[in-house]
Amino acid sequence: MPKKKPTPIQLNPTPDGSAVNGTSSAETNLEALQKKLEELELEEQQRNRLEAFLTQKQKVGELKDDDFEKISELGAGNGGVVFKVSHKPSGLVMARKLIHLEIKPAIRNQIIRELQVLHECNSPYIVGFYGVFYSDGEISICMEHMDGGSLDQVLKKAGRIPEQILGKVSIAVIKGLTYLREKHKIMHRDVKPSNILVNSRGEIKLCDFGVSGQLIDSMANSFVGTRSYMSPERLQGTHYSVQSDIWSMGLSLVEMAVGRYPIPPPDAKELELLFGCQVEGDAAETPPRPRTPGRPLSSYGMDSRPPMAIFELLDYIVNEPPAKLPSGVFSLEFQDFVNKCLIKNPAERADLKQLLVHAFIKRSDAEEVDFAGWLCSTIGLNQPSTPTHAASI
């Protein structure tokens, strides 16, 4: 018997998608939320932080353009621009993503309705959601501000991310994907370093997952990029599932461990430059094609080969052996974990349950790692910081 869809735990959305405070039901809502949090088997600190976030969210009320003051730009991608903003009525610092779409009002309203499911996504591994609204031709999605930014930004400063840190990242991504699948029957569809956010409290959270089919369709033509994290089955247009997210996670881990997007694989000379020593393993072999491969442009990494055209890159992902970690610089457990994520046949690829009990994850879970300390020293953040008023909890 299929699982019953979770009942919405949002504040009453208005037809235009803004969240409105129903003061009469606020206490009841909070009690219902607390019951849902109990089902998640969270650590005490995680539960306290989530409860604090949800309590302050109750005070936000209706979101509207006039109530925001821009602080700085956090980043821009295919989807739109993200700003760090101050919500003046509540005093909260938020991240506001602005998506400009030339669409009819009916489509716009459908997107806003579909995005309301984000109110139900409450997990330590998912970026908190304040609400969505429309103004001046743009859809605004208001989220928790993560002061460490995204892992692609962290990678640019770090050069490479250590295996122990990536162990903690892997746990968070697996738990985030598991939560989305088990509690909401949704897959992420866009796992990559820029969609994994971190903060000075040491939290690691997923953002920008595909909850709105209409938004995905409306933005289908906006892709501009030099790299792809899509699985071979998705690129070929065949049926895909959460197994596709696992491929994307595996490819992201190789990129963050090695220090550059790993397709095509680095040759022996580049590996020596990257790691400062001779590195063993298949990753150092020349790719099987007779041509000299290029590579996507990147602001980090030491590959001087000409950039690969996007169609050439996609062809490589589908037809050539998958990326892997070079031997000799990473543990066998980490190498095996990545290999199981990057099996080209999705039926043979490890699933979320198998990955959660993998030796690499078990070891990473047991390791004492000061993720917050590493992050703050790497990107020059003060620790602890206060991404929201809840930081002191």
From Swiss-Prot:
Domain (Protein kinase) ranges: 68-361
Task: Name the residues annotated as catalytic in the UniProt entry.
Answer: 190
Topology within the bilayer: Peripheral membrane protein
Output the PTM entry: Phosphorylation at Ser-218 and Ser-222 by MAP kinase kinase kinases (BRAF or MEKK1) positively regulates the kinase activity. Also phosphorylated at Thr-292 by MAPK1/ERK2 and at Ser-298 by PAK. MAPK1/ERK2 phosphorylation of Thr-292 occurs in response to cellular adhesion and leads to inhibition of Ser-298 phosphorylation by PAK. Autophosphorylated at Ser-218 and Ser-222, autophosphosphorylation is promoted by NEK10 following UV irradiation.
Q: Name one GO cellular component term.
A: focal adhesion
An example of a GO molecular function for this protein is: MAP kinase kinase activity
Q: Is the keyword Iron assigned to this protein?
A: no
On this chain, the residues bearing Phosphoserine are: 218, 222, 298
Chain intervals with Polar residues compositional bias: 9-26
What are the start and end residues of every segment in region (Disordered)? Answer: 1-26
Phosphothreonine: residues bearing it: 286, 292
> What is one GO biological process annotated to this record?
regulation of early endosome to late endosome transport
What's the domain of life for this entry?
A: Eukaryota
Q: Which InterPro entries match?
A: Kinase-like_dom_sf, MAP_kinase_kinase, Prot_kinase_dom, Protein_kinase_ATP_BS, Ser/Thr_kinase_AS
Q: Which Pfam families match?
A: Pkinase
Keyword set, alphabetical order: ATP-binding, Cytoplasm, Cytoskeleton, Kinase, Membrane, Nucleotide-binding, Nucleus, Phosphoprotein, Serine/threonine-protein kinase, Transferase, Tyrosine-protein kinase
Could you tell me which Gene3D superfamilies the record lists for this protein?
Phosphorylase Kinase, domain 1, Transferase(Phosphotransferase) domain 1
Activity regulation field: Ras proteins such as HRAS mediate the activation of RAF proteins such as RAF1 or BRAF which in turn activate extracellular signal-regulated kinases (ERK) through MAPK (mitogen-activated protein kinases) and ERK kinases MAP2K1/MEK1 and MAP2K2/MEK2. Activation occurs through phosphorylation of Ser-218 and Ser-222. MAP2K1/MEK1 binds KSR1 or KSR2 releasing the inhibitory intramolecular interaction between KSR1 or KSR2 protein kinase and N-terminal domains. This allows KSR1 or KSR2 dimerization with BRAF leading to BRAF activation and phosphorylation of MAP2K1.
Localization, UniProt:
Cytoplasm, Cytoskeleton, Microtubule organizing center, Centrosome; Cytoplasm, Cytoskeleton, Microtubule organizing center, Spindle pole body; Cytoplasm; Nucleus
Q: Where is this region: RAF1-binding?
A: 270-307
Q: Which reaction does it catalyse?
A: L-seryl-[protein] + ATP = O-phospho-L-seryl-[protein] + ADP + H(+); L-threonyl-[protein] + ATP = O-phospho-L-threonyl-[protein] + ADP + H(+); L-tyrosyl-[protein] + ATP = O-phospho-L-tyrosyl-[protein] + ADP + H(+)
To which protein family does this belong? Belongs to the protein kinase superfamily. STE Ser/Thr protein kinase family. MAP kinase kinase subfamily.
According to its UniProt entry, the function of this protein is described as: Dual specificity protein kinase which acts as an essential component of the MAP kinase signal transduction pathway. Binding of extracellular ligands such as growth factors, cytokines and hormones to their cell-surface receptors activates RAS and this initiates RAF1 activation. RAF1 then further activates the dual-specificity protein kinases MAP2K1/MEK1 and MAP2K2/MEK2.
Record's protein name: Dual specificity mitogen-activated protein kinase kinase 1
Per the UniProt entry, what species is this protein from, by scientific name? Cricetulus griseus
Gene field: MAP2K1
